[in-house]
């Protein structure tokens, strides 16, 4: 569950990225992550635990330093015991930005879930620290995490597997590699099971920057598919058997690109910046 924001403070940015973000000639997503983490004063901790590729963390360390971050530390967790180590907790306390790499989201949540590190990351985000993640590192940011599922575009009972995430937000359900891996159906199904939450489907090289004001801003070369169940009038997901299609009425779907926004408080999507750029 998200930590409470102390009076007089603002929550930090939450930045899920759809994976395969540009790390070479157009680093605008990672550059903006550094910017909202403090720009040239950014103090970033990279957590590559979801990945089994040892060079993953060092690659992001190199990029964030090149983008002007003042300090970058790679911090891997191999055991749950690591999550209680005072030195690691102190380093997370010092960070102004925390970044999760891609890999396997279940590896990450089963190591970190319920630990002092997970609790501290929620507390730090509630006190203004930006937290981002790419691919599997994006999925784990929310409370209701998509752990797997089937390809396709329809709502089908039992077609998605859900597990507890890190719980920085309970207002969204996040999926990644969205268009590239045909994941509309599993996001729709996840939202059908959890109609309190808004679904965010992130194409590759595309991010949703969720601000302290709960406005989603899109950055990157692809699209964000946003599934809003706030006006659903009927759902049969609770009565159909696994493998069978379900009915939902009143579901709203928005396709957002860079410059478009969605306000979670008002449930209003906007393309004002896009229309102004054409004038």
Where are these regions (language model features)?
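Glycine/threonine-rich flexible loop motifs
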Residues: 105-115
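N-terminal small/polar loop signature for handling phosphorylated ligands or for N-terminal nucleophile
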Residues: 83-97
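Structural recognition of the beta-strand scaffold that forms the well-ordered cores
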Residues: 15, 45-47, 73-74, 99-100, ...
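Catalytic-core regions built around general acid/base machinery
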Residues: 91-94, 114-128
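Catalytic nucleophile loop
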Residues: 100-102, 121-145
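Short, structured patches in soluble enzyme cores that scaffold and shape functional sites
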Residues: 76, 102, 125, 170-178
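C-terminal and late-domain segments of enzyme folds
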Residues: 1-40, 46, 51-59, 64-67, ...
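Short beta->alpha junction loops
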Residues: 49, 74-82
């Amino acid at each position: 569950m998200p930590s409470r924001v102390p009076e007089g403070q603002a929550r930090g940015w939450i930045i899920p990225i759809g994976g395969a973000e540009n790390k070479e000639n157009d680093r605008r997503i990672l550059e903006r992550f550094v910017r909202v983490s403090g720009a040239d004063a950014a103090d970033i901790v990279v957590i590559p635990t979801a990945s089994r590729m040892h060079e993953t963390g060092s690659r992001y360390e190199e990029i964030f330093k090149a983008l002007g971050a003042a300090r970058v530390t790679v911090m891997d967790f191999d055991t749950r015991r690591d999550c209680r180590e005072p030195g690691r907790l102190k380093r997370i306390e010092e960070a102004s930005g925390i970044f999760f790499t891609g890999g396997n989201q279940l590896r990450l949540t089963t190591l970190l879930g319920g630990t002092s590190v997970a609790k501290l990351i929620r507390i730090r985000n509630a006190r203004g620290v930006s937290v981002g993640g790419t691919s599997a590192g994006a999925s784990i940011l929310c409370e209701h995490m998509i752990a797997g599922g089937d390809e396709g575009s329809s709502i089908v009972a039992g077609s998605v597997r859900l597990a507890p995430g890190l719980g920085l937000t309970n207002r969204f359900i996040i999926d990644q590699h969205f268009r590239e891996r045909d994941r509309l159906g599993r996001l729709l199904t996840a939202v059908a099971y959890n109609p309190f939450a808004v679904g965010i489907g992130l194409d590759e090289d595309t991010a949703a920057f969720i601000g302290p004001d709960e406005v989603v801003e899109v950055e990157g070369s692809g699209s964000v598919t946003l599934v809003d169940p706030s006006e659903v009038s009927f759902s049969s997901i609770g009565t159909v058997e696994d493998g069978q299609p379900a009915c939902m009425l009143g579901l709203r779907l928005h396709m957002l690109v860079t410059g478009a926004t969605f306000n979670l408080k008002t449930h209003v999507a906007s393309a004002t910046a896009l229309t102004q750029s054409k004038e």
